[in-house]
Amino acid sequence: MRLLSFIALCGIVMMFTACSNEDVAQGSVETNTANNDNLTTFVTGNPATRTSLNYDDGAFFWESGDYIYVQDDNGTWHKSSNAPTEKTASFKFKVPGKYTDHTSYKVYYPGKQGINNNVTISASQLQKTPNSTAHIGEVGDCGTADATGGNGVFNFRLDHQAAILVFQPFTENDAVKNCYLTKIEVTSDNDITGTYTLDTTTGELTGSGSGKTITMTTKGDGSYAQGFPLKTSSANVATNGTYVVIRPGTHALTVRYWIKDYVTQVEGAVTKTYPAFDYEKNDYYDMTANLNVTDYDGTKYYMWDAENNYWNGHEWNSAAPWQPVLKDKDNSNYPKSGSDSCYYRSTEGIGRDDAKYSCKKLPNANELAWYAEKGDARWDGERIWTTMGHLYKGGMWFKNKAFIKLTESFSESYGPGFYGDMRDNWGMISKSVAQGAPVGFFAERYFFLPALGSYSVGYLYKIGEEGCYWSSSAGNNNSNCGYMLEFNKNTVSVNTTGSDVGYYVMEFE
């Protein structure tokens, strides 16, 4: 994690043309604009001054709508009567009040949503273009300075009181590179957002904020209307650098990176955790993350025990693709006869018949029954995954074989309960499922099966809605069928189906 200081040096020239004779109760804000003779000029002349920053060198600039606040000799708060109208390296602020009694005055920048020394770090933040910091003054960046000097000339070095996280997600998954970053949710173990006060003595943020979560939306106009791109295989601040303002301090963070595939219309989050770390004021921190979404091989759809996959030679990523990659799309060039090596292996449906080719290493019918009956099947509609160049979500969690064996007689030779050996005698199971991913100490003893759908007569059916997985056991209740495990958000079942459908081939844990 790189951190860079962004202390900015500012100069103030205070030109006392007249003293204000207006008495205003302490705590109110005076913004006299009627007569410039009653104003003091605060000049910021350093080219690296304030409220937006350059990532590479830490240079700051004033942005449109930036105001400063100063307490005068009477203790009255005064807001500058003017502000920049565009990004600028220097600006002459006009500030009402009397400033002749002291050689030091504290200057406050409470952000664009603040007043006097009151600061709001927003729970909802918005950045419209990558690697832009024009918004940080809007969402809680703030600062103070002790202006010292005399004879009408005062200088100060602005001390920023917030911390900034610079998120730079990347991915090695080509399907994720086709997606966009739509928002980032940052959740802390303590407060990072809310209303705070800039202490009049130390200048630091004080008080307890009201929120532990900040949501940064990463959408703008034009080419960024859908979000920020995710096209790089390593961190690149120019591509999608996102700046989130937080309260400084020691925080353990959980970050959810929300991404969306606008072809499938699937949106979901990749979660990363960052251990407790002291995010100091006046600094910004690189928060890089590899969005390593699991990708499932689109060439693993087979008819039961076929020698080659359903679209062999014309897979989705081949030179001459026939394979549909989106739900309800089809291609008529699917396998149609036994002479095709992509066609299923013919079976008689009498007694046991074990797979010889593509399904040979898969769980058999008995094992599928154990997973369905005793595997605590849990539907997870939020887990995202990719296949064939696109983002999808949804699937089922099951206890792994070793975990089931701790309490059950998991066996390859017979099914649970009264089923006996389902390879010899037909049986079927259908059960309701629980909802949500497993949590707690034993969560790591589960494995996930994505809802990869299936192919039938060339159509891709219910991807993201159903999971359909072959076993190594042919059906014994009819010819040319095979045992399979099938699930959706409500049920999980083990049964036989026609061998001519393209189900997924995967070894289970």
Where are these regions (language model features)?
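Sec-type signal peptide cleavage vicinity
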Residues: R2-E373, W379-G381, T387
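C-terminal, surface-exposed recognition/capping segments
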Residues: W385-M388, Y392-E509
